[in-house]
Regions:
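Active-site helix of classical SDR
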Residues: 14, 51, 59
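Short, small/polar-rich loop/turn modules that mediate ligand/substrate recognition or access, typified
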Residues: 67, 72, 123-125
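Active-site loop-to-helix junction immediately N-terminal to the catalytic Tyr of the SDR YXXXK motif
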Residues: 40-49, 61
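Short C-terminal tail/terminal secondary-structure segment
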Residues: 39, 113, 124-137
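Alpha-helical segment proximal to the catalytic Tyr-Lys
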Residues: 19, 64-65, 121
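Active-site Tyr-X3-Lys motif and surrounding loop/helix of classical short-chain dehydrogenase/reductase
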Residues: 1-4, 92
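Residue(s) in the substrate-gating loop at a strand-loop-helix junction
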Residues: 34
């Protein structure tokens, strides 16, 4: 199921929109993935990480195929996000993040807005790690 959702899901959704973007000569594709798709994590999530990695690889290749059409394709690989679980769990998890807190939805939204803007027209094929410094590249 992880490959179906996290790889083929990205591919199918992107294919539904890409032709129109290429015909118009402008478009921004931004996918949300996970740091588990870029680095190994010893938490028993191998299949999940492989699925996320497949979606990331797809976006990198797609970016090269459509770059000359004015369409960009980038991925945001997020780290731990505060999903309002048990406060003691959240506090423990936050201690493992170098900036000292978990991500918030607005952290992701700000980067999506930038990547979808004309200011990001020269950025394509990138996987941006958004994780409070937990993984650096």
């Amino acid at each position: 199921p992880y490959i179906d959702l996290n790889t083929y899901g990205v591919m199918n959704c992107t294919h539904a929109a890409i032709d129109g973007m290429c015909e118009r000569g402008h478009g921004r594709i931004v996918t949300i993935s996970s740091g588990a798709g870029t680095v190994g994590i010893p938490l028993g999530i191998t299949a999940y990480g492989a699925g996320k990695g497949g979606g990331i690889a797809f976006m990198r290749h797609l970016a090269m195929e459509v770059a000359a059409t004015g369409v960009t394709a980038n991925t945001i690989a997020i780290g731990m996000i505060d999903n309002h679980t048990d406060p003691s769990v959240t506090a423990h998890m936050a201690k493992t993040v170098p900036v000292g807190r978990l991500g918030q939805p607005h952290d992701i939204a700000a980067l999506v807005v930038y990547l979808a803007s004309d200011e990001a027209s020269w950025m394509t094929g990138q996987t941006l790690e958004l994780n409070g410094g937990s993984v650096t590249t």
